[in-house]
């Protein structure tokens, strides 16, 4: 597997993370030797020790921004805390989603007792009907959607798509098991259909406008 580097300078490196790869292991994780993390993968390919600025869920693919020094991390993180970074995701969801929709609904934070304001803009790009029965219907409908999270809550996009009854395919926690099982059985797809496709921001050190696009992984259908 090759490392897909989207951008690199003296301050950061941006890569296209594959599906089913942790950004980094939890401290004292027992799986460090058994399972390659993104940080380890980058080190193997470049000999760079890098520091994550943000995270993608293990089963989400796409753009990840990493700093080359710990002292650079806070400047890049400010882009996210100030919502000064434009994020675009692509997902496949159950059913025919609305042409456009703004989802304004609180999402639980890392403290599961506290809800935080969350806003997502959604647009449907394509729809398809598969002549494959998925209970309780004789065929199955799906939509390719473009998602713009305007806040950065944990699992925000996954929760918001469930809120409008169009869960992401492959979402074992919030999704529809019948449809997930069909994709495994018919297509061998056992990942989450969520891809961080674009990241746009003004570089905090050079003031350069950075516009990154991560191609879909080969295993996207």
Specify the residue positions occupied by each region the protein language model found:
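RNA pseudouridine synthases
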Residues: 1-221
């Amino acid at each position: 597997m090759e490392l897909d580097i989207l951008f690199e300078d003296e301050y950061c490196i941006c890569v296209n993370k594959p599906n089913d790869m942790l950004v980094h292991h939890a401290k004292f994780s027992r799986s460090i030797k058994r399972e390659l993390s993104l940080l380890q993968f980058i080190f193997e390919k470049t000999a760079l020790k890098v520091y994550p600025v943000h995270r993608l869920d293990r089963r989400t693919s796409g753009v990840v921004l990493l700093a080359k020094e710990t002292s650079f991390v806070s400047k890049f993180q400010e882009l996210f805390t100030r919502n000064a970074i434009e994020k675009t995701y692509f997902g496949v969801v159950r059913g025919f989603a609305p042409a456009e929709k703004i989802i304004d609904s609180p999402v639980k934070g890392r403290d599961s007792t506290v809800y935080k304001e969350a806003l997502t803009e959604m647009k449907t790009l394509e729809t398809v009907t598969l002549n494959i029965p998925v209970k309780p219907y004789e065929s199955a409908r799906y939509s390719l959607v473009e998602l713009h999270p305007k806040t950065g809550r944990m699992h925000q996009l996954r929760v918001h798509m469930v809120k409008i009854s169009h869960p992401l395919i492959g979402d074992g926690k919030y999704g529809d098991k019948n449809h997930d099982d069909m994709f495994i059985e018919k297509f061998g797809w056992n990942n989450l259909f969520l891809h961080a496709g674009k990241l746009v921001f003004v570089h905090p050190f050079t003031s350069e406008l950075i516009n990154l696009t991560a191609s879909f992984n080969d295993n996207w259908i």
